[in-house]
A protein has these predicted regions:
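A cross-family structural signal marking well-folded subdomains
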Residues: 1-180
Length: 180
């Protein structure tokens, strides 16, 4: 995390929301000041007491993914789309990394396609001026479904069921956004 100048608490928030059920939190969003109490109260999900090494290995694996997705080096496997996220939303934008961490079970084809979906969603959040709290709430709600996606076919079904209707609702107010 130090190599990308990232705050550990931000990673922990995204790690937890990407990998575990946070639906009991307000809007499904775990705040930084709630992380330690959430962990203390959710061993049943994390199983850090029963399987501490597996929990740490999962966290270590996701740190490496987080850094990899943040740097998005090379043009292979859809990394161009992750690079474009930074160009669209700015260097400080990192909300999409929560989605990328949730996508860790996807096969290579699905993951490459998912990076393109993420780029498109970020484009629509920027162009439609969707607030950060709405974007974060939306992304957090998608994580539980994204965790179960393994193939391009199941990704297509998720996009049709969840992403397209959400983006369409954001586009409803396009004319007024362009006139501002």
């Amino acid at each position: 995390l130090e190599s990308i100048d990232e705050k550990p608490l931000r990673f922990l928030r995204y790690f937890i929301m990407a990998n575990y059920d946070t639906s009991k939190e307000k809007d499904g969003i775990l705040r930084e000041d709630q992380i330690y109490s959430w962990l203390s109260n959710n061993n049943d999900q994390c199983q850090y007491e029963e399987k501490p090494f597996q929990f740490v290995e999962k966290m270590k694996h996701d740190v490496n993914l987080y850094v990899k997705y943040r740097k998005a080096q090379g043009d292979d496997a859809g990394n161009m789309h992750l690079k474009n996220v930074t160009m669209l939303a700015g260097n400080s934008y990192k909300l999409h990394l929560m989605l990328m961490l949730a996508a860790s079970e996807m096969d290579e084809e699905a993951l490459s396609k998912f990076k393109e979906v993420v780029e498109s969603v970020v484009y629509y959040t920027v162009i439609n001026r969707i607030t950060t709290n709405i974007t974060e709430r939306t992304f957090a709600s998608w994580c539980s479904e994204i965790r179960r996606i393994t193939s391009a076919e199941s990704l297509d079904a998720f996009v049709a069921r969840a992403v397209i209707p959400t983006v369409t609702s954001w586009k409803q107010d396009n004319q007024s956004n362009f006139m501002r």
